[in-house]
C-alpha cells in the first residue's frame, strides 16, 4: 500500500438490515468514518433482491424492525402481522432517509476481494468498479439469503420460453395471466409464490422433490389494542426477544409431544 493511513476506519459489505445497523452504530455511536459497499441499487439486502410474488416476512412485524430509534417504534404502523416485501422496503428506505445513511453508502458496487496487510494493519478492499480502498476494520454483512442458487438444468440455455429465478425477479413484476407456468420446488419461497401465481396463471404445475412441513401463517391485520399495548411495552418486548432462544416472543413447551393426546397434537 502506498499510504499507511487507511481511507476509512471501517468498511461494511452489504446494506441490508445488518449493514444498515453497523453503519449507524459505527458512525453515529463510535464516531468512525465508514463506507458501505452494496451490490444492489439501494438498501434492503435480501428484500431488495427477493421481490417474487407473495414475498413477505415470516416474523412478527413488531419485532422485525430496528430498536435503536424508540420514536420510530412508536410512529411506524405496520399494515399486517407479516408485511410484504414492498412494505418492508418502504420501512428500510424510511430508516435510511431518517438517519442519513445513504451518504456513506456506495450502491451497485460488489466487493470482489480483500486482503489484510499486516505491515500497515489495514484491509485493502477491491470492488467490481475498480475501487481499491483501505480500512482498519472490515465487516461482512452479506447475509445468507440473497445468493442465487441457480440449478444446473440441462437445456435451460436453449429453453424458448421465459424463465425466472425468485431471487432475481423483475422489479416491475411479471403478468402470468393466461400463461402455463411451472414452479420448481416447494420450500419457503415457493410456499409464498405458488398461491399468488396460481391466481393469475391459466395452468400451474408444481414440481416437488420432497414434501416440506408448513404451518398456517394466520396472517392479517393486527388488533389496534394489541399494537397499542406492545408500543407501551417496547422496552419489555426488546428484553424478552433478546432473552428468547428464537429471538421472538415464542417459547418451548416444557413437555414431550408424547405426553399429549393425539387431539392436542393436531
Residue ranges and their predicted role:
Residues 78-145:
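Feature captures the FAD/FMN-dependent oxidoreductase FAD-binding
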Amino acid at each position: 500500500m502506498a499510504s499507511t493511513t487507511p481511507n476509512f476506519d471501517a468498511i461494511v459489505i452489504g446494506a441490508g438490515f445488518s449493514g444498515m445497523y453497523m453503519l449507524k452504530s459505527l458512525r453515529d455511536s463510535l464516531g468512525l468514518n465508514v463506507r458501505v459497499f452494496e451490490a444492489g441499487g439501494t438498501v434492503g439486502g435480501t428484500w431488495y433482491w427477493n421481490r417474487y410474488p407473495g414475498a413477505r416476512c415470516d416474523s412478527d412485524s413488531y419485532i422485525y424492525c430496528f430498536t435503536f430509534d424508540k420514536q420510530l417504534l412508536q410512529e411506524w404502523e405496520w399494515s399486517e402481522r407479516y408485511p410484504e416485501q414492498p412494505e418492508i422496503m418502504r420501512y428500510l428506505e424510511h430508516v435510511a432517509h431518517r438517519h442519513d445513511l445513504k451518504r456513506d453508502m456506495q450502491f451497485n458496487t460488489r466487493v470482489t476481494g480483500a486482503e489484510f496487510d499486516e505491515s500497515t494493519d489495514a484491509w485493502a478492499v477491491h470492488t467490481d468498479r475498480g475501487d481499491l480502498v483501505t480500512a482498519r476494520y472490515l465487516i461482512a454483512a452479506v447475509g445468507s439469503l440473497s445468493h442465487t442458487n441457480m440449478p444446473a438444468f440441462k437445456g435451460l440455455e436453449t429453453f424458448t420460453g421465459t424463465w425466472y429465478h425468485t431471487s432475481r425477479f423483475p422489479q416491475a413484476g411479471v403478468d402470468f395471466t393466461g400463461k402455463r407456468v411451472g414452479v420448481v420446488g416447494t420450500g419457503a419461497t415457493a410456499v409464498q409464490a405458488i398461491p399468488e401465481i396460481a391466481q393469475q396463471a391459466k395452468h400451474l404445475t408444481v414440481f416437488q422433490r420432497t414434501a416440506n412441513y408448513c404451518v398456517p401463517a394466520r396472517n392479517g391485520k393486527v388488533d389496534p389494542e394489541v399494537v397499542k399495548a406492545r408500543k407501551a411495552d417496547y422496552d419489555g418486548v426488546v428484553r424478552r426477544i433478546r432473552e428468547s432462544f428464537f429471538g421472538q416472543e415464542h417459547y418451548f413447551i416444557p413437555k414431550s409431544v408424547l405426553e399429549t393426546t393425539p387431539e392436542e397434537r393436531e
